[in-house]
């Protein structure tokens, strides 16, 4: 057996088979990862939008080491300075608000749902309007808010109080608002749904609708937040301010970390005992998060995400029209989807075989989520691999500069 086969065998014997793993990774640095058999890959999924500052950024690693050597965990029965500093930083980036810390995106969205219900309780408001094709997590309430029945199958009956409207359809959302509506929950970019950005007019219309009806606008920033779209938060591209929003994935710099940031009038309904997390805001995870945020600022990675995303999208767009099965490119910043007219899984597997890691989503979309630190040379290398794989799928052999003729 190879080393990879040995580890895969251990998984088969000892780990619940909820994931369809394909390779054993043992090392990461920047935009590259190494498997157990020594092969190197360009990582264009970043732990699913988690490693915005790349694998093992030295400043994040140093922050984790220093904090782990000082204080690892005390629970939220006590104050810690590192959590306070992180909350101050996030609130400042968000233009104000208060934070609640947890451990994942699903937990953060559960917190948003509980916050909205508690805020609306005195008026009998409990219902959440979310979007068709959305994804908000795998715990039962976040799953009920998710607008994709394939994830709910087998777990019925779903918790009540959730309805879905078509994404980017303001009239459809308005038609669902009742005197029981507590909040509208929306992603600025639907990631799991196929890299579909919210239209500016749609997000602004939701903000106006919520103001008119006295309900909360909640944004799920778990995948699109923290610089991935070229702004700190995806909703900022539309110039709107939600009443509360969720964060996770990239927040911990590679460690488990989730959070919500809520306007004070909303946040203050979470009084002692109303919600809690033993590990939320753990000092080591908080140190990693604060270091990650500082790296994004110090290395100007918001601008880098916008510039690198434009370069990558421009390269992908040359494939549209050139190859029959490539139909569109969409996304914002470094959250990019290559849309096919056939299942994307085969192309993703071909890319991996050529040394590039990507993801299939929404059946026909290849999803790319490279670190914000990705270099132009790495983007160009990825584009070469992608066109090689696409050409091969079309039965076309591409000439290369190093080939004769």
PLM region spans:
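Conserved N-terminal phosphate-binding loop of PLP-dependent enzymes in the Aspartate aminotransferase
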Residues: 1-405
């Amino acid at each position: 057996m190879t080393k990879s086969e040995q580890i895969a065998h251990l998984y088969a014997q000892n780990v619940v088979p909820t994931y369809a793993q394909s390779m054993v990774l043992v090392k990461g640095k920047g935009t590259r990862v190494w498997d157990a058999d020594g092969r190197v890959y360009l990582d264009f999924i970043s732990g699913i939008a988690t490693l915005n500052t790349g694998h093992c950024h030295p400043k994040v690693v140093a922050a984790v080491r220093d904090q782990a050597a000082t204080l690892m965990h005390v629970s939220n029965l006590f104050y810690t300075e590192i959590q306070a500093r992180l909350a101050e930083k996030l609130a400042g980036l968000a233009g104000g608000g208060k934070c609640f810390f947890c451990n994942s995106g699903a937990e953060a969205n559960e917190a948003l749902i509980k916050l909205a219900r508690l805020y609306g309780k005195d008026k009998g408001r409990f219902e959440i309007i979310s979007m068709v094709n959305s994804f908000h997590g795998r715990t039962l309430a976040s799953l009920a808010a998710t607008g994709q029945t394939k994830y709910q199958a087998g777990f019925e009956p779903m918790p009540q109080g959730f309805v879905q409207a078509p994404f980017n359809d303001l009239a459809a959302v308005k038609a669902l608002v009742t005197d029981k509506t507590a909040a509208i929950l929306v992603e600025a970019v639907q990631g799991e749904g196929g890299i579909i950005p919210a239209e500016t007019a749609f997000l602004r219309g939701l903000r106006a609708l919520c103001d008119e009806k006295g309900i909360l606008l909640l944004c799920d920033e778990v995948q699109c937040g923290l610089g991935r779209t070229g702004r700190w938060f995806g909703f900022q591209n539309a110039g709107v301010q939600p009443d509360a929003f969720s964060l996770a994935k990239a927040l911990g710099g590679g460690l488990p970390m989730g959070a919500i940031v809520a306007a004070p009038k909303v946040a203050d309904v979470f009084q002692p005992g109303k919600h809690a997390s033993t590990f939320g805001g753990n000092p080591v995870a908080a140190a990693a998060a604060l270091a990650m945020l500082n790296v994004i600022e110090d290395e100007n990675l918001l601008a880098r995400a916008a510039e690198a995303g434009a370069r990558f999208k421009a390269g992908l767009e040359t494939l549209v029209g050139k190859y029959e099965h490539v139909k569109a490119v969409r996304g914002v910043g470094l959250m990019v989807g290559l849309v096919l007219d056939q299942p994307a899984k085969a192309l993703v597997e071909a890319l991996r075989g050529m040394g590039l890691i990507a993801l299939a989503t929404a059946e026909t979309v290849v999803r790319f989520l490279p670190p914000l630190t990705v270099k132009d040379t790495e983007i160009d290398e990825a584009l070469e691999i992608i066109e090689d794989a696409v050409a091969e799928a079309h039965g076309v052999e591409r000439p290369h500069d190093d080939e004769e003729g």
